[in-house]
Amino acid sequence: MNLEAFVLGCGGMMPLPHRHLTSVLLRREGELFLFDGGEGTQISIRRLNLKWKKITAIFVSHMHADHVTGLPGILMLSSQVDRDEPLYIFGPPKLADYIEQSRRSLDMYINYEIIVSEITEPGIVWKGEGFHVRAFPLRHTKTCYGYAMEEDLRPGAFHPDKAQSMGVPRGPLWSVLQSGNDVRLDDGTVVRPEDVMGPTRSGRKFSYLTDSLYFPDVSREVAGSDLLICEGMFESALLPSAIEKKHMTSAQAATIARDAGSVRKLGLIHYSPRYTERDLKLLLDEARAIFPDTVLTRDRMDFPIEYLD
């Protein structure tokens, strides 16, 4: 089952010619899930040739303009692609009012159902087939949430040699066992899945974390992430500014990834516009000194997320 993350915009605060505002899209077996929708989100979706109508749900971190100004255009354009499925939008207080005011002020033509759910407490906000999305609180200048998409546990690896040694012939019965069901042989012997399969295996996990003051406990929320997309807005020399504005340095993002345990890759995002493309190397170097598997995300960069086993 394919799982892939696309960075639609990597910039923070204001758009630049080469950096749209923060937005990440997750594609899982054809379904699309959008995390934030800053200015320029539509452009990246179009350039990546992604399908508007495949966006099942949108998860908004907080109600600051650089994270939501791309949403009205997405809502309007979704009416032009024969969408007939509801669009679910999750986020903090005032999100529903923003969506409704945008619809009325812009006199939007919407031919599908929009279901907005304002998050009042952390926890699972979306359950899909074989996965869920969980919201966790961050520490910003207003109510803000991070999100983690985590797949369910998978069955263990099937061992054909064990199946054959227990008298289960190659064929459909193997599929029955791999599906988690017992098999009864002609002689009455019952073979159970645990007899021929290894221990359960983890699914994949994607975490999205922006905007927030650094605090150690947040590492627990992203533990085990195959891909962690986390803001790295400032260099360490600007830590006082990061604290004042309730943002993070790239070194703090790397500390979260390191302390979480089992994070496979960290992608920095939400860069301050003060940094040129050349300057961003400083953010990367400071992060890699703490967590080597760190990359600078760029607009329209994609990250395939593979199973470990």
Where are these regions (language model features)?
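General small-molecule cofactor/ligand-binding pocket signal
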Residues: 6, 90, 115-120, 134-136, ...
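Active-site metal-binding motif and surrounding structural segment of the metallo-beta-lactamase
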Residues: 39-90, 118-120
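Active-site-proximal loop/helix segment associated with metal-binding centers of metalloenzymes
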Residues: 15-17, 131-208, 212-221, 227-229
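Active-site neighborhood of phospho(di)ester-bond hydrolases with catalytic His/Asp-centered motifs
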Residues: 35-38, 55-63, 91-92, 207-212, ...
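Binuclear metal-ion centers of metallo-dependent hydrolases, dominated by the metallo-beta-lactamase
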Residues: 122-123, 214-309
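Conserved beta-strand hairpin/beta-sheet module of binuclear metal-dependent hydrolase folds
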Residues: 1-48, 84-86, 147-149, 156, ...
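Metal-dependent catalytic neighborhoods of phosphoester/phosphodiester hydrolases
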Residues: 70-77, 102, 276-285
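Active-site neighborhood of divalent metal-dependent phosphoester bond hydrolases
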Residues: 83-87, 92-118, 274-276
